[in-house]
């Protein structure tokens, strides 16, 4: 009987522990991302000619990616995209000509957007994008 009470107590403590831990919900993430421009590598371009992205996320679920060549800073073009956050993942949909980009476990820490980048469901790398003023 003592053994049952002991295990019941441990189970109760674990239940409370899980109940009090929380993840940032999608609305909080959405608010942190919206209306800002985030600059970094979203895996456009080629190894010998990489492109840096500056993504602006507007509150209507649309955005624009101001792309520049990483080596010389010359404009590479602007790409419109749709974006949304679902279950802690930021989705960037540039249309059929480009892979769907997912930033899983997305979080904003200070001036940095951080997470794991996936292209069409395949893990690429951990990334950090810096917020621009």
What spans do the regions from the language model cover?
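Acyl-CoA/ACP chain-elongation machinery
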Residues: 83
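Hydrophobic helical h-region of N-terminal Sec-dependent signal peptides
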Residues: 9-17
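Bacterial N-terminal signal peptides that target proteins for export
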Residues: 1-10
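C-terminal motif of bacterial Sec signal peptides marking the signal peptidase cleavage site
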Residues: 18-22
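Lipid interaction determinants
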Residues: 24-78, 89-133
